[in-house]
Amino acid sequence: MMLFRRSFIAAATAALTVSALPALAQETTPAPAESAQTAEQMPQGKVLPDIVLGQADAPVTIVEYASFTCPHCAAFHDENLPKLKAEYIDTGKVKFIQRDVYFDAVGLWAGILARCGGDDKYYAVSDLLMSGQKTWLDAKTMDDISANLRKVGAKAGMTPEQMDACWNDKQKVADLVATFQTHATADKVEGTPSFVIDGEKVSNQPWDEMKKVIDAKLAAKG
């Protein structure tokens, strides 16, 4: 599991805020260093609403803290999320919320892309990023990663202009960072993937063990 100290949240947030965000023009060239956003230039961020997968009135809520650059997160999405969806989400027993964690600028770029198509497409884009993580992260340069992310966006039906607008939206970037910082601090997140199941913090674990926790929460609802 990819671990980070709680104190890292503040440091990571500061670093992300001043990092150069990719313009990702059609040539897939990131914005030059001189165009980097500074903390003073960034607007005040606000906490964005959660994007729910499943029925809003499902009795049990599962929150996952995940990073798009975390291999264990990708493994959960490839192996266990389909089981969770089939057995609990699609049957109305559980609603699922993914909250993005940003370890680095690349993870932030991917997080912006996931939100770029709107809330209705968030989980579809997230699935593309997680299932294709080894492919789009397998790059020698940031230019290559930029190009790979653009391919993911195009596969999700986004235009180059749409992606550029999202990556250059200072307010959205500030909001995503504020959302990450607020939730991760409140839930004392120490690594990814981490889960909060009806208020109980749960670490990444085999499916059979997670299933026991979910079933116990459902039984407690009566």
Give residue ranges: language-model regions.
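Structural alpha/beta surface segment adjacent to cysteine/selenocysteine redox centers
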Residues: 68, 74-154
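Periplasmic c-type cytochrome electron-transfer domains
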Residues: 32-45, 140, 144-149, 200
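Extracytoplasmic thiol/disulfide redox context detector
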Residues: 2-3, 9-104, 177, 181, ...
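Residue-level signal for pocket-adjacent positions within structured domains
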Residues: 46-48, 131, 197
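Extracellular/periplasmic catalytic domains that process cell-envelope and extracellular macromolecules
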Residues: 56, 89-91, 121, 187-190
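A short structural micro-motif
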Residues: 18, 132-135, 170-173
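C-terminal cap of thioredoxin/glutaredoxin-like
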Residues: 2-7, 24-34, 67, 151-222
